[in-house]
Amino acid sequence: TDSCPWSHGSLASNTMYRVGWATRAAANDARRQLLEIAGREFFDNAALDDLDITEGIVHLRNEDASNRRVSISEVLHVLRSDTLGQTSSITGRPAVPMPPATTFARQFGAQFVEVEVDIETGQIKLLDFVAAQDSGTVVNPQVLKNQVVGGGICGAGFAIYEHLVFDEDTGAIKNGNLLDYKLLRAADFPWKAEVLFAESYDPVGPFGARGAGESPIAAGISAVAQAVYNATGVWVDLPMTPERVVRALGGV
């Protein structure tokens, strides 16, 4: 925190905005430093606007590709040092705080869940999971898929298991540990979860992207709740524990 500027923190689905813009600004700063060194050392003090980087190679914008070309590693070699612990590196840093207008945008998601409900025991089993997510430009497909699936797991856990039990006399939490506070395990969620991306372009997000923190959780809760209703014909209070399912079905 000594070198981190003040911010609202990684919350409210703002991480893509805050970290994304900061990373992009830092990368642009590092690129600027790299081109300054390259222009001075290899291109006769060429201006920044006259240089470009293509696939790790620094070159003049308006010259044929066969002309002077220098790799990034060669540029960094200029910074070499014989001092132990010194490395040839450039550190990029964003120069200004991110404007407040770039910290929020709505995200959209829908999830579909197939469940099996045992009407005798009230047990709910998740059979299939499909999600559609619009979080702007998909910067990293695998990371976004993991985020959506993780949100779906969290939402399903809220719908089926997770709740705090309080002592009626003292108000103390009675299940304040992972032995008594039930969570979904890997085996409880469909292993072949499918995520579809509906890409759009967010005008204020980094590269048109926006967050995906909360919508997968909210969609997961409602998807499981409605799937149980479609299977049983009754609405069950959340979390839909076996006891509550049996009671809703008139078995208790």
For each feature predicted by the language model, list its residue ranges.
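C-terminal catalytic domains of large/alpha subunits in multi-subunit enzymes
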Residues: T1-V252
